[in-house]
A protein has these predicted regions:
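C-terminal and inter-domain tail/linker signature
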Residues: 1-142
């Protein structure tokens, strides 16, 4: 597949499930998918692991959405810089609803095989989310 085709696949995977279209996950993720994210205790495994993660966040942020801001592709890899937004109106990681609007940035590197995403490394501003929820204090300026 071309770099542009790979970017389209990854963009769809990053954006559509957050709009409620979980069916796209089965179309775009390989059954042997592994998703690495330091904010999670274990890697995500397969389409079901990906869907469960999205569902958990959508339960906490009913209007959750991700927008892909920029992508760079080379060979079988796509790097995507994205922004996630949503109103915290459900439980998340033991944190009850705060009603606060949250905006976070993240970066995902996706590896594709045969037109499907088989592995991803994601790093996003979990700490910033916790600050916006008033769970941890803002850092003092130097």
């Amino acid at each position: 597949m071309s770099s542009e085709q790979n970017k389209t696949i990854v963009r769809r995977l990053l954006e559509e499930p957050w709009k409620g279209n979980l069916k796209v996950v089965d179309e775009l993720i390989d059954r042997n998918y592994v998703g690495h994210d330091p904010s999670l205790p274990e890697p995500l495994r397969g389409p079901d692991g990906f869907k469960e993660n999205v569902s958990n966040y959508r339960a906490a942020y009913s209007d959750a959405r991700i927008t892909v801001d920029e992508q760079i592709a080379e060979g079988d890899k796509v790097a995507s810089r994205w922004t996630g937004r949503g109103k915290h109106d459900g439980d998340l990681m033991g944190i009850g609803p705060t009603g606060k609007q949250v905006t976070v940035s993240g970066l995902t590197i996706s590896r594709l095989e045969n037109g499907k995403v088989i592995e991803e490394y994601t790093n996003w501003d979990t700490f910033g989310m916790m600050q916006q929820l008033d769970v941890v204090p803002e850092l003092a300026h130097a």
